[in-house]
Amino acid sequence: MPELPEVETTRRGVEPHLEGRTLLGAVVRNPSLRWPVPPDLSERVAGEKVLAVRRRAKYLLLECESGTLLIHLGMSGSLRVMPAGAPPQKHDHLDLLLGEQVLRFRDPRRFGAVLWHLGPVEMHPLLQALGPEPLSDAFDGAALHQAIRRRGSPIKLAIMDNHVVVGVGNIYANESLFHAGISPARAACDLSRADCDRLAAEIKAVLRRAIDAGGSTLRDFVDSEGKPGYFQQTYMVYNRQEEPCRLCGTPIRQIRQGQRSTYYCPLCQP
């Protein structure tokens, strides 16, 4: 599933092709995504100038003169800038028309979304209750400590909660906890302020390194040019069960938390 680094990589890739351009309409081949594509999407976006391409959590926001397009990549989605005449493939569900180019939305599993919103986009129901951005100044050890101090859930599940901090999915939660030296099973409320300072710093560092590497490609993700990410080559724990820890040699363990796999080193993360 594309997480924050993959969505940010996509944003940076499509921004030069979209910002300042006028949308000519849309071609919707399959409206049955996680939420139905508006039936009049082409009419709504035709003539709209793209003022900015932003990201909020795992949502891409194409801010136009009259409204905002919200795009979520779901479990397997990607966006690519293609020549207008490029024939669509099986899972290419939607094109935004840019003249000689199109922005093509591909989503094999159809858990993504393309929605149109009028008014302040921060008030959209999908966005209005979100926590702070992990790479912003609003997220630090103090903010993390305040958000989790009454939570008895495991810390890994806490940092994956979008009310605590947005965009930290399973891959990057595992990696951040390893670098912070914190067991994923520790109760969130048991973390000290020093623990939270360390964890917040590592979340930022891991996400920045992942963005610099173009994100992670485990199955479907490619960037706007069709290229895979490379951060998976540097994983310390994720998907490395029974392999030796890169720091101490102890076999990496795998457990289940919240219906997801968790990976950790029992020696480095006591």
From Swiss-Prot:
Cofactor: Zn(2+)
GO molecular function (one): damaged DNA binding
Keyword Hydrolase recorded: yes
PROSITE patterns noted in UniProt: FPG_CAT (PS51068), ZF_FPG_1 (PS01242), ZF_FPG_2 (PS51066)
Note on how the cofactor is bound: Binds 1 zinc ion per subunit.
Domain of life assignment: Bacteria
Entry annotated with the keyword Translocase: no
Any one biological process term the GO annotation gives: base-excision repair
Zinc finger (FPG-type): 236-270
Matching HAMAP family: Fapy_DNA_glycosyl
Family: Belongs to the FPG family.
Protein name stated in the entry: Formamidopyrimidine-DNA glycosylase
Classification lineage: Bacteria, Pseudomonadati, Pseudomonadota, Betaproteobacteria, Neisseriales
Gene this chain is encoded by: mutM
